[in-house]
């Protein structure tokens, strides 16, 4: 049996510039962090006496006798990629899917990590990110960027740069005290709305209107935000104000990024004392993140009392094998269906 634990991520700056159609021409960068909410993937080989080959438990329950019959496209293609057969796989997440936290890519990274361990192989964080990007973007042709896979694999508070069909990861150098202050001043609220990121990304980049200027402005904010984080003489409140700036830019990149309800909640938060914030992910729903000084946080919580607040702390580990107990495996010779 193999169990992997892979963190979800929140992206602060640069979202949209991690799309190959943009960064291969202009370069791209994001600042993001993983936090202590995870997806867990449990994989083991099936005993040979069951009348089915594989059993998969995700948002649905599947029992199949052929990998090609698997309905979940990500599971199916990852199994084919690593020649995985006769398994029982279960997925559990601390937070709901399609909510702007990179859940699909986190699942991809965690599942690939588990499959490699099942095969007795070790893969680097870079290799796991590259494989997850390949299966989601090239094999499944899902529209989206690269940052989610990289963040889930590496973990931590990082600047991720994208260029020439490649990426590089650089940790943000920040004192533990300053990092804790940032952590303490960020509040996460669940709107209760789920959506498909790939559909919103496709809408954003399929429109004939050129979004290059907004994306270049969002890219420039990555440098500004990094300077705020790493310069101990600067107030972290500037980070919150930059979040407000990047959110306003992001809203201009697609009609599905926000809606009237989200805009109303955002305005309520600013009036209650938040310095800035954003809707995480591609937009359309999910989680709202706000930067708010501690002395004003009760006002913010009261203003958004209809939303669920999700306590969190930053984490640094990225995907990891939590439990490793390998099994001997031989393909079954005959399947008797009942």
Model-derived regions, located:
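Glycine-rich active-site/cofactor-binding loop and its immediate structural neighborhood
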Residues: 285
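Short secondary-structure capping/junction motifs at helix and strand boundaries
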Residues: 86-90, 121-128
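C-terminal nucleotide
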Residues: 1-13, 18-24, 30-32, 38-83, ...
């Amino acid at each position: 049996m193999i169990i992997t634990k892979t963190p979800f991520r929140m992206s602060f700056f640069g979202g949209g510039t991690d799309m190959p159609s943009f960064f291969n021409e202009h370069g791209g960068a994001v600042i993001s962090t993983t936090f202590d909410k995870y997806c867990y993937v449990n994989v083991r080989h099936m005993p040979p006496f069951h009348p089915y080959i594989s059993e998969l438990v995700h948002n649905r329950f599947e029992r199949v006798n052929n990998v090609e019959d698997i309905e979940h496209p990500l599971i199916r293609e990852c199994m084919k990629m690593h020649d995985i057969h006769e398994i029982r796989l279960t997925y559990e997440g601390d937070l709901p899917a399609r909510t702007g936290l990179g859940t699909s890519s986190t699942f991809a990274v965690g599942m690939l990590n588990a499959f490699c361990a099942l095969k007795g192989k070790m893969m680097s964080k870079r290799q796991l990110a590259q494989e997850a990007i390949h299966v989601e973007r090239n094999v499944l042709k899902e529209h989206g960027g690269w940052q989610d896979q990289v963040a889930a694999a590496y973990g931590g508070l990082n600047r991720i740069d994208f260029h020439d069909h490649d990426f590089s990861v650089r940790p943000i150098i920040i004192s533990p005290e300053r990092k804790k202050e940032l952590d303490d001043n960020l509040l996460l609220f669940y709107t209760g709305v789920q959506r498909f990121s790939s559909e919103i990304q496709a809408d954003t980049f399929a429109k004939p209107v050129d979004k290059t200027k907004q994306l270049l402005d969002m890219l420039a904010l990555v440098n500004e935000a990094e300077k705020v984080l790493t310069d101990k003489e600067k107030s972290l409140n500037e980070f919150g104000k930059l979040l407000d700036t990047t959110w306003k830019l992001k809203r201009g990149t697609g009609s599905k990024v926000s809606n009237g309800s989200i805009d109303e909640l955002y305005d309520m938060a600013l009036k209650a004392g938040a310095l800035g914030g954003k809707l995480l992910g591609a937009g359309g729903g999910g989680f709202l993140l706000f930067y708010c000084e501690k002395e004003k946080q009760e006002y913010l919580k009261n203003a958004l009392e209809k939303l669920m607040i999700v306590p969190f702390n930053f984490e640094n580990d990225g995907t990891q094998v939590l439990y490793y107990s390998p099994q001997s495996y031989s393909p079954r010779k005959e399947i008797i269906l009942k």
